[in-house]
Structure formats: structure tokens, C-alpha cells
Amino acid sequence: MVKYSYYPGNVARQSSYEVEDTIQPLCKTLGIELFEIVGYNSDGGNIIKQGNKDLQLTLNARNIALAEKNGHHIITACASAQGILHEALETFRNDPIALANANTVLSKTCGITAKVDEITTSHLLHVLVDEIGLDKVEDAVINPLNMDVACYYGPHMQRAGACGGDDAWNPNYMEKLIMALGGRPVEYKSKTSSVGNPSLLSLGDSVMKMTARVLNDAKKAGAQIIVSACTQSHSNLDSYQGKAGRVANKDTNIPAVN
């Protein structure tokens, strides 16, 4: 049994309840014990960062400090959360002043501080492939997927250090996982492109065109469904796919799931 501090991210318990409904039994089946980060807060979603970088860093320092109290490394099912947490850890380790400033706020408001010297953060995908092993995943399959699946990574965790042992430039962990589940991964050119979720309210049409490109590319490549490693980006791919298709004048009609 491997143990992790579980960070749900911004939407797993809001607009994407299916993530919470599936991650708990999945982890139990595969021997991953989740210890919730009690009292966790939003990581800022790279939206707060646009107006106040220090505030977003402090929000992440608080989550890190709470996870350190649990005594376990962090796991999340959201690529955005993984990328943001990793970036915060990297910033704090390279910039002691940034860490000191965040800890000053935390000490005054919460009575806690973050150390950041040992803790790590991982996406569930990387834990399944790197630590649990795809053989164990395959052995646990009851109903093989048997579908043509387009994998959407999102850009946040596709950077050195944030993507586990995967290739940051040409990732393939999701494709390997899909094959272990009995599905057929479909290659398409925009699988690591951004859909612009943090700019959804400020750059609406541009974001819709970015979203439409991903959906249309996946559909043209023959995918029956698109699976997102990012719960935040999933809202674009699912809830906004009709609008994205109209704005970009492209066929975007494809089921999108987390």
C-alpha cells in the first residue's frame, strides 16, 4: 500500500464530481491510500497569478504545509494542479525570499509554515505508470475499454520534473494506460496544446478556437472519445465544445471525459 496526501484540485468536487466518484475506488483497488489534505484551498488555477503572483504562491504554500503535516507526498488527478504545485515547489526551492514571504503570511493567518525540502507532487497518471505499474492495472481490468481514445494532456504538467518519467515533449503515459485498459489510443497533433482555460473570461473567442482545434483534431484522427488528464481543461473540452465549434466553425462533437 502506497500512501499519498490527496489534493482534489479546483473542480473535482464542484463541476466534475465523476473524478471524485472514481478516484477513491480506483485507488483502493490498486493499493493507493489517500490521506486528504484537510482544509485545502484552491491553487489559484493560474488565474489569480495573472493579478497577484505572490497570492497564488502563498495559496500553494498553505496546501504544501498541510500536506507536510500529513507526512506524505502529494497526489492529484488534475494536470493543472500538478503543474501549479510543481512550479510553486520549484519557485520556493530556488527563491528563499519567496518562501519566506509566503511563510510570513501563513504564520500570521494560519499558524503554519511550509518547509518544501522533501515533499513532492505527482499526477495520478504518473503514479499509476511509474509506481503501481501497468501490469497491475491491466490485471485489475474487468470490462476492457475497447474504444478509440484520444488522450489530452494539457500543457501544465508537460515540463521537466512535473511529468514523472514521461517525455515532456512527446508524452505517451496516457496512451500506455489506455492500452492497459483495453483501449486503442489515437495519435493527433494537438494532444499537448493548451485550451486556454485560465483565459476563458478574458479571451473568450481565442480560447474557443484553441479548444475547437483540440476537439476537431481528435475527431478527425478517428477518436470515439477524448480523455483529459486535466480536470480544469475538461470544462473547455466538454461544457464549451458546442460554443467552440460555432466560434471556430469546426466539428467539435465528441464525448469528453476526465
Residue ranges and their predicted role:
Residues 1-258:
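Iron-sulfur cluster-binding electron-transfer modules in prokaryotic oxidoreductases
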